[in-house]
Every structure is written in C-alpha cells, then in structure tokens.
UniProtKB/Swiss-Prot annotation:
GO terms for cellular component: chloroplast; chloroplast inner membrane; mitochondrion. It is a multi-pass membrane protein. One of its GO terms (biological process) is protein import into chloroplast stroma. The chain crosses the membrane at residues 131-151, 160-180, 204-224, 230-250. Disruption phenotype: No visible phenotype. Tic20-I and tic20-IV double mutant is embryo lethal. Residues 1-48 form a transit peptide. It holds the Pfam family TIC20. Involved in protein precursor import into chloroplasts. Partially redundant with TIC20-I, but not with TIC20-II or TIC20-V. Belongs to the Tic20 family. The lineage of its organism: Eukaryota, Viridiplantae, Streptophyta, Embryophyta, Tracheophyta. This is Protein TIC 20-IV, chloroplastic. Part of the Tic complex. Keywords: Chloroplast, Membrane, Plastid, Plastid inner membrane, Protein transport, Transit peptide, Transmembrane, Transmembrane helix, Transport.
Length: 284
C-alpha cells in the first residue's frame, strides 16, 4: 500500500486511510518534507512523530506490512467525513462478485392458449354428448368418397365402405350450414354449458372445415384431381388420417380430457374463451 498513511487522533479512536498527497490533516500541522534514507522497507514506513507532536496533537502512525489496521473503523470514519461525494468503503479487502450464471433456454409460451384445468372428471352424459359432434362430422364429410376407389380396387376390404358413416347414405347439403350455425351460437357461445362440451363441439366443426379446405386446395394439383394411381393413394391417406383424428378425439371425449391436435386445439380454445366480432358491451 504505497502512498497511504493511517491517521489517528488523541481524543477518540478515529482512524482513517488517506493518500499522502491528499491528507485530510491541514498542511500547517504536518511537515511536508519527509526524507527516507536508503534503508530497508520497514524503516521507510517510520515517521518522525516528535516533530509533528509539537505543533499538532494528532499523530501519524506508521503503516507497516505487519501492522493490523481496523478497517471497520476506517470505513465508519470515511463515511462520516466523505458522505457527500465519495462512496462508502467496503468492510473487507476482497469484493464478493456474483457468479456468472450460464445462459439457459426459456420455453416461449407466448402464442400458446392454456386450457382450463379439469378438476373433476365430467359426468358420463357430458362425455357421451361430447362424442356426438365427431360422429356428425364423420357423417357429413366426404371421407367415404375419398377412400372408395382404393377399397374397390382391393376386393378383400371392399365391404369396408359400408361401415364408414356417410359413404352410402348422405345427408342434405343444407344440413351442414344449419348445424354449424346452431351449434356455434347455442352451444359454443353458451357460457352456462361446461367448457368441456363447448370445446369438443367446436373441435368437431373445425375438423370438418379443415377437410373441406384440403379438398378445395388439392384440386389445383393435376395428378390429384384426376382419378389416377397417385390420386387414389393420396385421397386414401387423407381419408384414413381424418378417421384416425376423429377416433382420437372420441377417445379423449370419453376419457374426459381435451384433445391435443396441433393448430386445432388453440383455434377451438380461442372460439370458446373469447368473443370474436359482433356487438359487445362497451367497457365502463
């Protein structure tokens, strides 16, 4: 600690550290010229206190390598003297730095809609009613028309067409429009009904709508539009995928849980939890 001096007073135990060039003691009480001969380091730290004691009651104690300095008292005194401009001294010599934490990957759930938690399992009649929208979606869909060329080519599974709802007996075309309007207004937006039932009702209508969107967009591809080998296998894959999705949704409805399908689950949650469009009551 080169260039520092520990200063003490006779009236109180006030000890502080200050540079030699900027000592808090007035210069008229301290002899500014102090010469150190070419001796060892311990002799360089000794000061002649006799010359200073005649003029000033304060003494400058020598600061050696083995000397013990009360840093707590020095910090207290420095806070009292330099409270206006300088920050307080640390009680210890070593600063405790906060360890640098490694970077972690945080899961981003900003665009995810959280579904309400089902505390108790719904009653059996609610679970049965939740399966009806999926059966209606299978009945009014064109799945039987999609898989019919593939089943007719293979005689072993040709009779399977009779077990697919909607393949033989088709409902009128206006039924889908009436069903979607009444189901959306009376069931999905009805807050008095359980959210579990409203969610599965909306999920069934969204799956049927998605199948119609796929049918309209697929007609732009020539190899799929015409009844060829590639088109037969393509529509067979679309039809059986739709049937598997409906069976999975029916399983979730009977189990009393929400069906987890990418994009469809969030869309059904938005329709059941929020009011999109229409006339709403103004906020007060």
């Amino acid at each position: 600690m080169q260039g520092l001096a520990a200063t003490t007073t006779n009236r109180g135990s006030l000890t502080f550290l200050a540079p030699r060039n900027h000592s808090p003691i007035s210069k008229k009480f301290v002899n500014p010229r102090v010469f150190f001969p070419n001796v060892d380091s311990s002799a360089k730290l000794r000061l002649s206190a006799s010359s200073i004691s005649r003029r000033c009651p304060r003494e400058i104690a020598p600061l050696s390598a083995t000397a013990s300095v009360d840093f707590a008292a020095a910090a207290t005194s420095s806070n009292q003297l330099f409270a206006n401009g300088l920050p307080p001294l640390a009680p210890g010599l070593r600063r405790h730095r906060r360890p640098i934490e490694p970077a972690r990957v945080a899961k981003d759930d900003f665009f995810k809609i959280k579904l309400p938690k089902i505390a108790e399992r719904p009653e059996w009649w609610w679970r049965t009613l939740a399966c009806v929208p999926y059966l209606i979606s299978l009945q009014i869909s064109d799945v039987g028309f999609y898989v019919q060329p593939f089943l007719e080519k293979h005689d072993a599974i040709g009779d399977m067409i009779y077990f697919i709802p909607g393949a033989i007996n088709r409902w009128p075309t206006w039924f889908f429009m009436v069903y979607c309007y009444l189901g959306y207004m009376w069931v999905v937006k009805n807050k008095e009904l359980p959210h579990y039932l409203r969610f599965h009702m909306m999920m069934g209508m969204l799956l049927e709508t998605a199948l119609q969107v796929i049918w309209c967009t697929s007609n732009f591809f020539p190899l799929i539009h015409f009844k060829g080998r590639f088109g037969m296998y393509y529509w067979m894959a679309i039809g059986f995928t739709y049937i598997c999705l409906l069976l999975e949704c029916i399983r979730c409805a009977l189990a009393g849980v929400y069906a987890q399908i990418p994009f469809m689950t969030d869309a059904a949650s938005i329709h059941t939890l929020f009011n999109l469009g229409g006339f709403q009551r103004p906020l007060r």
